[in-house]
UniProtKB/Swiss-Prot annotation:
The lineage of its organism: Eukaryota, Metazoa, Chordata, Craniata, Vertebrata. InterPro entries: Centromere_Cenp-M (IPR020987), P-loop_NTPase (IPR027417). It comes from Bos taurus. It holds the Pfam family CENP-M. This is Centromere protein M. Signal peptide: none annotated.
Length: 180
């Protein structure tokens, strides 16, 4: 097992692959199913992992986007994501990593403060999305958003690159780190 690198495999023709990393297996599977139902012009492949590193596999396709899913109700979820981040090559953070925080709808039950996840995403200069994956409509909307983000990261949207999208998303961030 070694660090995951973005360009260690050749891209598949009209194929986009996303890796969802998180400790909530049921929520990840539901999100993956919603993504596969979403309208996509590319062949969509969704892989799930509880943590990184991934076992070495010759058959694994190139991963175009990694989404780290943090459940705000579980400190284990945050710890697993933090430990997994060190197993990524730095080149992945050039527009091919995103964080997804779930469970923010019920603040009273959160064991992780939102600012902790905001600071984590800011540290790695990666976009942070919030969504309550337990609600089907929200999950479907997030699945569509992730599919579109994946198509851009895979290079299937003319005129837009992952790095370009990252700079656009970073420019639209509301709070600065100093305000937190």
């Amino acid at each position: 097992m070694s660090a995951l690198r973005p360009l260690d495999k050749l891209p598949g023709l009209n194929t986009a692959t996303i890796l969802l990393v998180g400790t909530e297996d049921a929520l990840l599977q539901q999100l993956a199913d919603s993504m596969l139902k979403a309208d996509c012009t590319s062949e969509l492949k969704v892989h799930l992992a509880r943590s990184l590193p991934l076992p070495c596999s010759v058959n694994r396709p190139r991963i175009d986007l990694i989404v780290f899913v943090v459940n705000l109700h579980s400190k284990l979820s945050l710890q697993s994501v933090e430990e997994s981040l060190c197993h990524l090559d730095a080149a992945f953070f050039l527009g091919k990593v995103a964080f997804l925080a779930t469970g923010a709808g019920r603040d009273s039950h959160c064991s992780i403060h939102r600012n902790t996840v905001v600071k984590l995403a800011h540290t790695y200069r990666s976009p942070l999305l919030f969504c309550d994956l337990e609600i089907e409509d929200f999950r479907a909307a997030m699945a569509q958003r992730l599919v579109r983000l994946l198509q851009i990261c895979a290079g299937h949207v003319p005129g837009v690159s992952a790095l370009n999208l990252l700079s656009l998303m970073r420019g639209s961030e509301n709070p600065s780190l100093e305000d937190l």
